[in-house]
Amino acid sequence: MTIITIISGMYIYSLLSQDAHHSQYGQNTNLVLKKPIPKPQTAAFNQESTMASTTLLPSTSTQFLDRTFSTSSSSSRPKLQSLSFSSTLRNKKLVVPCYVSSSVNKKSSVSSSLQSPTFKPPSWKKLCNDVTNLIPKTTNQNPKLNPVQRTAAMVLDAVENAMISHERRRHPHPKTADPAVQIAGNFFPVPEKPVVHNLPVTGTVPECIQGVYVRNGANPLHKPVSGHHLFDGDGMVHAVRFDNGSVSYACRFTETNRLVQERECGRPVFPKAIGELHGHLGIAKLMLFNTRGLFGLVDPTGGLGVANAGLVYFNGHLLAMSEDDLPYHVKVTQTGDLETSGRYDFDGQLKSTMIAHPKIDPETRELFALSYDVVSKPYLKYFRFTSDGEKSPDVEIPLDQPTMIHDFAITENFVVIPDQQVVFRLPEMIRGGSPVVYDEKKKSRFGILNKNAKDASSIQWIEVPDCFCFHLWNSWEEPETDEVVVIGSCMTPPDSIFNEHDETLQSVLSEIRLNLKTGESTRRPVISEQVNLEAGMVNRNLLGRKTRYAYLALTEPWPKVSGFAKVDLSTGEIRKYIYGEGKYGGEPLFLPSGDGEEDGGYIMVFVHDEEKVKSELQLINAVNMKLEATVTLPSRVPYGFHGTFISKEDLSKQALC
């Protein structure tokens, strides 16, 4: 019965391919764009970043992947630890693939077009012949599988490879889904690194810095077999521990349900939410994944997420998060190493996914969070946890359609929820497009809801035209004007992280004022010059209260981070700290040094020298913007996402499970 499902799925895929007039990654046929079709651009990469390291990047995408994922490397190239995925994990050799099939078509190139090239759809007979030819001839089988499962695994691998092969012949990946672009240069993954102690330090580490700096990032375990976006990579946490002048470093995968199963299988089998779930191939991938589940080859019930985006320390738990799953509890050991305790549901209280940017009120120590659903209502829920970890009932937020909500904000009394113009429309996949689309007819708005609300009846929606903030840095109340002030980076084109564009991406630090009395809004740029500012924070001890300073990454030239900026939110004054020629970093983390001035503290940031292929952690005085100390790291640290700092006192109170 299931074999019939497989063949039927292939047949449907073939028919859909014959009817397709647009690329699976192409334009949405039902949307009208007033602006010219933008140039291929991604929030994670541009052409300059793709060519950043000539020692790593061959002339074609397939050559790049074949070279960098091979088990050997030329002695003429820098011996980066990421050049082979046959590295050991937790000192254990990777498991022999349980149903790895032969490689797909090797011809691939990077295209700058949103349109599909003219092609002749493959015949059904040709597709079946390709399936037969691609059935693996290996004798390596997972002993845990019974004969039916082994046969099903080989057939399913062959079907998947045939589909991918045909797609590559039809058109190349766009840059937003091309592995050779998305994991090029220092975005390329690294193997785990057990803890290394007594790292060399230049300068002096301030005595007040006691604890561990942890930062999350995407680090794919396996070579992608199809489309791949930076956000699709497996989560890896990098940790630098400070203990009375001694500094250590370690990096470990977060052992998600997805990663554990794919390690056993020896290949990626879970669908990649951004890089693969586009168009007809995305539909077929979902069908194949469901069929694998029917045969017991995969178990999605333990979660699908990668836990690669955010980190928060709450109630004795360090939580690694991505918005497609529950968080994962990661422990920092006494030696400074990292261990995954498992998927964390707050003692059975959390039944749904949670976004990667929960907020902790610095005074009450409560945690506030959202959960969104792209398939069924309610599309959005709000909830909170007391400082002891007790969850409130869910508050269903009324939305007409599922919306991309990566971040939100809190004030002393309110939560501020964005409902913007980037939405999920799964039927777009049937038309050959992306399920993540920009809806220009929709009006962006912010909802203001009391933190302790038991339902959404009192929520006040205020429109903010043409506003898409991927991140919100802070928000506060100004009672004298009946306004809620929101500080965020407004991004244009809004969907450029997910879909290709010709238009150059801009991220404008903005002040948005929401008048609770009139129901009107205003928006203005905080600084006069156009500088892309993304990834950063304010003093976390003042979150939800009025702050003067924000510390944000200088994503120039986009998408690389050449330094960070200390921005005076009241005057617009900007002070820049530049890492130096050929050096790039990521999110600057502000660590307060005490209860003194708001900017009293230090900036921590990973910096990578692309010429020397070496990474370091820099500590910068946030008051005078001078370098205090540099920690030389034992291995390369890829560019990543968000981090946090856990004090020595909090480390001593870690939960055991």
From Swiss-Prot:
Keyword line: Abscisic acid biosynthesis, Chloroplast, Dioxygenase, Iron, Metal-binding, Oxidoreductase, Plastid, Transit peptide
Give the reaction(s) catalysed: a 9-cis-epoxycarotenoid + O2 = a 12'-apo-carotenal + 2-cis,4-trans-xanthoxin; 9-cis-violaxanthin + O2 = (3S,5R,6S)-5,6-epoxy-3-hydroxy-5,6-dihydro-12'-apo-beta-caroten-12'-al + 2-cis,4-trans-xanthoxin; 9'-cis-neoxanthin + O2 = (3S,5R,6R)-3,5-dihydroxy-6,7-didehydro-5,6-dihydro-12'-apo-beta-caroten-12'-al + 2-cis,4-trans-xanthoxin
Question: What tissues is it present in?
Answer: Expressed in developing siliques, embryo and endosperm.
Give me any GO biological process, just one: abscisic acid biosynthetic process
**InterPro entries assigned to the protein according to its UniProt record, in alphabetical order:** Carotenoid_Oase (IPR004294)
Q: For this UniProt entry, what is the primary localization, expressed as one broad class?
A: plastid
Q: Where in the cell is it found?
A: Plastid, Chloroplast stroma
- Species of provenance: Arabidopsis thaliana
Q: What is this protein called?
A: 9-cis-epoxycarotenoid dioxygenase NCED9, chloroplastic
Q: Could you tell me the EC number(s) of this protein?
A: 1.13.11.51
GO function term, MF aspect, one: 9-cis-epoxycarotenoid dioxygenase activity
Q: What does this protein do?
A: Has a 11,12(11',12') 9-cis epoxycarotenoid cleavage activity. Catalyzes the first step of abscisic-acid biosynthesis from carotenoids. Contributes probably to abscisic acid synthesis for the induction of seed dormancy.
Cite the Pfam families for this sequence: RPE65
Q: What induces it?
A: Low induction by drought stress.
For activity, the cofactor(s) needed are:
Fe(2+)
Q: How is the cofactor bound?
A: Binds 1 Fe(2+) ion per subunit.
